A protein has these predicted regions:
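Charge-dense, helix-prone N-terminal extensions
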Residues: 1-104
Length: 104
């Protein structure tokens, strides 16, 4: 089941206090980036973030976004300030994005 644009809009409202949030649609779901780092996504109308020490300190419910994927944490918080703090705390634990080489 693909995620709805309405649910994505709701998640983006929650992320309004997070700088440089971008999305990328992929196979009916949405990947979420902040400052170029992939930190989570919207999968089957569920807002999930990567599991890091910082995110595990706030969230407890693990869910698998799709078959074969690593478990992620369900964001069941509706307070935009809490969500912004959560994302800000987990970003330093994520790797820097890999730079793509240009084709010649």
């Amino acid at each position: 089941m693909a995620s709805s644009e309405e649910y994505l809009a709701y998640v983006l409202d929650l992320l309004a206090n997070v700088p440089e949030v971008t999305t990328r649609k992929m196979m009916g779901e949405y990947l979420l980036y902040a400052s170029g780092k992939l930190f989570g996504g919207v999968y089957d109308d569920r807002f999930l973030v990567k599991s890091t020490d910082a995110s595990r300190a706030v969230l407890t419910t693990e869910q698998v976004p799709y078959e074969g994927a690593a478990p992620m944490l369900l964001v069941d918080v509706e307070d935009a300030d809490v969500v912004a703090t959560l994302v800000a705390s987990l970003l330093p634990e994520l790797p820097e994005p890999k730079r793509r080489q240009r084709r010649r």
